[in-house]
Regions:
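Metallocofactor- and cofactor-centric catalytic cores in central/energy metabolism, strongly enriched
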Residues: 286-290, 296-297, 535-536, 722-729
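Long insertion/accessory domains within large nucleic-acid-processing enzymes
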Residues: 693-736
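Charged, amphipathic alpha-helical regulatory modules used
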Residues: 1-105, 109, 727-733
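A short glycine/serine-rich beta->alpha loop
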Residues: 8-9, 31, 51-52, 428, ...
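Contiguous, well-ordered alpha-helical segments that form the cores/surfaces of helical PPI scaffolds
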Residues: 26, 523-536, 557, 709
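Conserved catalytic cores of very large enzyme subunits
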Residues: 89-90, 95-519, 540-541, 545-705
């Protein structure tokens, strides 16, 4: 008697003869004689009593065909065979169609899912082949049936599902001091500890490049200035030794001089030790600048993940007030301002200025001059973004101004917005930690279903919150299932990540599982489309209605509360994410359109609004936007971002950037950035803020590249954006 069925993907499931009955009745229903439930049950019963303990799906279907062909209803056999062949062709056709678009390098939402990936190259094509092949395996083999149904019905989205079988984690804030002080082993080579700024810069690149191959998300350095500062000093001391060697004079005492700053100055009129000191400073600044140039250049040219994607890198800086730390900050800003190559804007690393009162924000602060410079650089090059360490939820009582390692108590962020700080299972820090995986809830679908279920507003909201709780429970259970799968990975699967970079991993042996250390990371539940959800529930979004704002905050606060509860239930660091939604914004919308049709203000565009943002098409002032979006950030502890679109050439108006940072300070906003248009001629390098240009005003060439921020990061060309994000870009309005 059959007990188990072997599915096409290799899974063994319990045999259920009612599935045979249902399949036969479906074939009978399209014949003249119609259904015969007695015959269908008789055939199913005969097959189920075959002298086999298990059979494959194909074997069972062969048996059904034989029984039908040898029975009184041969016309049913023909319908059954035709349907079986049709389903087989459909399965093959779907994969074939997707693969064909990759082969032909077609620009569509499959090949443009990730704007940082070039899917047209051979390596990029291989990545997409693997990605599209893996997702069905995950659906069939790794997801619970109800989770798979929730994904198929567009309620939730599992991010980086193609990496699910690899057991990889999402991202990490690199404790770079470990690499710099102890060296590293990568591939067939190994590096000694850094002794100068150039080596430190290269090791920073190698660390992020190597670990990106072991993870499916981004790489970040939480305290770029603090980590590299000691190597500025080592470089200075090396320059002093060079001077002694060249001149034959003993200038070793200069190595003990405490410098107030590293500023390049003319040597004219200087003599003896004073001249030697300034020359050493000048050389150190020059070498530091070149090291920062090399770092930025490498981050934009060294490919990772099979050779088709540059490292999705971020660096945090701004709070090191030492002379050496300030030198690092100044030269990374100088490098960014000047651009790379022919003066183009560097796409990576995403740079993040740590804004903190008493350190790097107010006129009397020691790094205020560098803060002003950072705003000038951001006005021209989009970066740095701004991280508000003064936000109430970003402050840490352990932070002390005289602590040389105070950066350990400073929140760091990465990429579009990812934030990891609170910790139930270890130190409260960003360093050596990251996200494990995240899943997003489609708030819009829940809102539409509640809208259609009742005309009474109170009843509608009751239904919505009931559905929201169901979706939250589903997402939490799915993330816990993925965690249970991830924790079985062995340390040796992540040779550099788990060699001491991930918090606590240094104690693991190669064949140990990572179970004991990955709980230092976070599991995040995100959301998309709050604005459209509010329109469905009460007819207006939160940017245009106080009532909608009140409800929006109630929804997100409710989500955050439930997610905090999951942390206790599952004993993991669960957090609430304002999902960045690059490819997802269009995917959810496209499917909901098929289900609900075009609903004005809700499904009438090709995208849903990002997380808790005001819709991009809504005209308002920067302050209104800050006032509305700011209160959500305290609930979105897995990450959030505030952005403002500015008009004209921001290059000549860095004060506008400073005013926006002031709004962040005023409205308790955690992380923000400024968007503006930048069009560059690829022939002559001319740059302008003029949008929609067809011809370069300088050389009259037509090879123009438009640079814009897609979610929280830049893309070298909008040609790589998917259709949903391109539609959103067209709808963006200036906030003024």
């Amino acid at each position: 008697m059959i007990q188990y069925v072997v599915k096409r993907d290799g899974r063994r499931v319990e045999f259920n003869n009612q599935k045979i009955v249902a399949a036969i009745l479906k074939a009978m229903a399209v014949t003249e004689k119609g259904e015969d439930i007695v015959l269908a049950a008789k055939i199913a019963d005969k097959i189920s009593h075959l002298n086999k303990s298990e059979m494959s799906v194909e074997e069972i279907q062969d048996c059904v065909e034989n029984e039908l062909m040898n029975g009184p209803r041969q016309e049913v056999a023909k319908k059954y065979i035709a349907y079986r062949n049709k389903r087989s062709l459909a399965r093959k056709a779907k994969s074939t169609e997707i693969f064909q678009t990759i082969i032909e390098a077609q620009a569509n939402d499959v090949t443009r899912e990730n704007a940082n990936m070039n899917a047209d190259t051979p390596a990029g094509m291989m990545m997409k082949f693997a990605s599209e092949s893996t997702k069905p395996f995950v659906d069939e083999c790794l997801l619970a049936d109800d989770v798979r149904a929730a994904v198929e019905k567009n309620y939730i989205h599992i991010h980086d599902k193609d990496y699910y079988p690899t057991k990889s984690l999402t991202c990490i804030q690199h404790p770079l001091d470990i690499i710099l002080e102890h060296g590293l082993k990568a591939g067939h080579g190994e590096s000694r500890p850094a002794k100068r700024i150039e080596t430190a810069s290269v090791l920073a690149c190698i660390s992020m490049e190597t670990v990106q191959n072991e993870m499916h998300g981004g790489q970040a350095i939480p305290a770029f200035d603090f980590y590299l500062a000691p190597y500025v000093r080592k470089t200075f001391e090396e320059e002093v030794d060079k001077i002694s060697d060249i001149t034959g004079e003993d200038y070793s005492a200069l190595k003990d001089v405490k410098l107030d700053d590293y500023i390049r100055r003319d040597l004219a009129g200087l003599r003896g030790s004073e001249r030697a000191l300034q020359h050493a400073v000048n050389q150190t600044v020059s070498r530091t600048h070149q090291a920062m140039e090399a770092f930025v250049h490498n981050m934009n040219t060294i490919h990772s993940r099979g050779g088709n994607q540059v490292v999705f890198s971020s660096i945090n800086y701004g709070t090191d007030t030492s002379a050496e730390g300030r030198c690092i900050i100044r030269e990374i800003l100088n490098t960014t301002y000047l651009g790379v190559g022919n003066g183009s804007t560097a796409i990576f690393p995403i740079q993040i200025w740590k804004k903190k009162r008493g350190v790097s924000y107010l006129p009397e602060d020691p790094n205020y001059d560098l803060y002003k410079f950072a705003c000038k650089v951001s006005a021209r090059r989009f970066f740095p973004n701004f991280l508000n360490l003064d936000a109430t939820y970003n402050q840490d009582d352990a932070w002390k101004a005289d602590d040389p390692k105070r950066y350990e108590h400073e929140v760091a962020t990465m990429g579009c917005r990812t934030r990891v700080y609170g910790n139930k299972f270890g130190p409260k820090t960003s360093i050596g930690r990251g996200n494990l995986s995240f899943t997003t809830i489609n708030l819009v679908k829940l809102g539409i279903e509640a809208m259609q279920a009742s005309e009474d507003r109170d009843e509608r909201l009751r239904i919505f919150f009931e559905k929201l709780d169901w979706a939250l429970d589903m997402a939490a259970r799915q993330l816990n299932d993925r965690f249970e799968f991830q924790k079985t990975a062995l340390k040796k699967q992540f040779p550099l990540l788990m060699a001491g970079l991930w918090l606590g991993s240094g104690k693991l042996d190669d064949n140990d599982t990572i179970e004991s250390v990955i709980n230092q990371g976070t599991l995040s539940i995100g959301f998309i489309g709050l604005a459209e959800c509010l329109i469905a529930l009460i007819g207006k979004h939160h940017g245009e209605s106080d009532e909608a704002q009140e409800l929006g905050l109630r929804i997100v606060e409710h989500m955050a509360g439930k997610i905090n509860g999951f942390a206790e239930t599952y004993q993991h660091n669960f957090t609430c994410l304002a999902t960045p939604a690059e490819g997802l914004s269009g995917k959810f919308t496209k499917r909901d359109k098929k289900t609900f049709g075009i609903i004005p203000g809700i499904t009438d565009k090709d995208y849903y609004t990002n997380s808790s943002h005001i819709p991009v098409y809504y005209h308002c002032t920067p302050e209104h936007k800050a006032k509305i979006e700011g209160p959500y950030h305290k609930y979105e502890n897995a990450g959030h971002i505030f952005y403002v679109e500015v008009d004209g050439d921001a290059t000549h108006n860095p004060e506008a950037i400073m005013r926006i940072v002031d709004l962040m300070d005023k409205y308790d906003i955690g992380y923000g950035s400024v968007n503006h248009n930048r069009t560059r001629c690829l022939d002559c390098g001319y740059e302008t803020a003029e949008p929609n240009l067809d011809e370069c005003p300088h050389c009259h060439g037509h090879h123009l590249d438009t640079l814009q921020r897609i979610t929280g990061y830049l893309v070298g060309t909008t040609n790589r954006w998917n259709s949903g994000k391109l539609a959103e870009l067209r709808d963006r309005v200036v906030h003024k």
